[in-house]
Amino acid sequence: MLWLMTMGRRLNGVYAAFMLVAFMMGIAGALQAPTLSLFLSREVGAQPFWVGLFYTVNAIAGILVSLALAKRSDSRGDRRRLIMFCCLMAVGNALLFAFNRHYLTLITCGVMLASVANAAMPQLFALAREYADSSAREVVMFSSIMRAQLSLAWVIGPPLAFMLALNYGFTTMFSIAAGIFVISLALIAFKLPSVARVEQPSEGAEVLVQAGGWHDKNVRMLFIASTLMWTCNTMYIIDMPLWISSDLGLPDSLAGILMGTAAGLEIPAMILAGYYVKRWGKRNMMVTAVAAGVLFY
């Protein structure tokens, strides 16, 4: 009971707003991402090469825009206003996909809107960390709870996405995603705080830290390994819905159920990994995870 009362005091007010926004933005994102390849192939009529090109352009644009926005938000400006702007772009992106079926428009305007919109979630976590630091709260615990909200959103989002897309159409699904982003925007505007900017390290020191890190062989190997692992996972998310429906002839909705189930299993897996990492070691944990991926694929 004491634990529940303590958590209640920690998670009221602004903290509850942070978790609700993370959950709702996660739901909106989970409505769009799992069905995108199906949308491009069936609704837009894009061939496999053009579907892959869309993801490539989207990824490159997302990296460039996210880096630019992160650099700006870390140095100056109100992070909350930036999140609101990203949510506004997310609304525009969802409405564009809801009512447009022209490939060239989607790969240009849609990708640019999505690149800005995708920066909302990392900026939200950064704002939450800054607020937790400024209010002398437990940052690690609060961040973990917020990440759990995101995982929970991916348990619900993919099955809901395929249900809406297959039964009511992609226009309805994207419109609902836009509505969720509008609600998130309102919560951010009226419930989340602005946090005073903390003085940043000098530019010279930052350059030295970045250079020293990249010159470390272990850092480079970790970067390459992470890139390869994320490449495999991204290929799976893109191709799995099409593989289930086209090659296996199974119901399209099964893809959403599989993604949601995987996200649900991910929550206890992350908790167990955090518990056993001190006993097994981070390196052994990573090797085990990669071996599991090899067996899966």
PLM regions: where:
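Transmembrane alpha-helical segments of major facilitator superfamily
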Residues: 53-62, 146, 150, 257-266
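Hydrophobic core of transmembrane alpha-helices in multi-pass small-molecule transporters
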Residues: 23, 103-121, 227-228
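Helix-to-loop junctions at the C-terminal end of transmembrane segments
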Residues: 64-78, 165, 269-282
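Cytoplasmic helix-loop-helix junction between adjacent transmembrane helices
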Residues: 111-148
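Juxtamembrane intracellular "pre-TM" segments in multi-pass secondary transporters
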Residues: 1-12, 193-225
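Helix-loop boundary and gating motifs at the non-cytosolic
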Residues: 4-59, 220-221, 225, 230-251, ...
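Structural signature of the two symmetry-related core transmembrane helices
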Residues: 81-96, 178, 284-297
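Symmetry-related core transmembrane helices of the 12-TM Major Facilitator Superfamily/SLC fold
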Residues: 172-190
